[in-house]
Every structure is written in C-alpha cells, then in structure tokens.
Amino acid sequence: MISPYIAEFVGTTILLLLGSGIVANVSLSKTKGSKETPLITITTAWGFAVFVAAYVTGEFSGAHLNPAVTIGLVVAGKFSVDLMIGYIIAQVLGAMLGSWLTYVFYIDHYRSTSDENAVMGSFCTSPAIRNYKNNF
C-alpha cells in the first residue's frame, strides 16, 4: 500500500509535468508543438493530465492533487484536518518537482524564447490585458 502523501506527491508531479509540459511545447520557440490549434491541444492535454494523475493516485489518496481541493474537503467536513497539512505539503512539493522537470526538459527552448509571456505561460496564468482595477 502506497502512502497517501506519496500518492499526492506523485500525482501532482504528473499533473504539473504533463500540463505545464504541453503548454511549454505549444508556446515556446523551436518546439514540435502545434501552433495552429493551441487551445484544443492545451485543454485536451490538461484534461488528460488530470485523468492520468487521478487514475494513478485515486485509490491511494483520493486524488486531491490540489491544496484547494483538500482545504475544500476539510471545510465541508469530508476530510480529516489531521491529514490536511501533509497532503498540502506533498502537493506543493509535487507541483514544484513537476514544474522543475518541465523546465529541465525544455531548458533550451526557454532560453531561445524571447516572448516573456510565452515563458511565463507554461508556469502560471495572467490577464491578457493588464488593468489592475478590473483584474482585482
């Protein structure tokens, strides 16, 4: 039996590696990703990433894969407060590893991409039009 903490760590690593990896493949310079249909490619791949991560970890940890899910379940009284901190630590560390692996696998592409938004886009989201009054 695998520890639920290890399962959350591995699942979140898979989720971020596959999800961020496809965004990097589509957005960065000189990759083989399809630039013609990025929205379909990215959304389908993220859906697949969630499916794979949940399938791999669901039996062992419930496949929260996100601190917001864990906190929401605790607030709803459907998950133990005692396990929450361990789950969140495992998820954050897994997300860090998945993001780092994406960077390592695409390091040459990150270095050759001059568009800062394309580089940032594989790791986070931001408004397309920055307007602090409307964005917050």
Language model features: what each stretch is:
Residues 1-136:
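Membrane-interface helix-loop junctions and terminal tails of multi-pass membrane proteins
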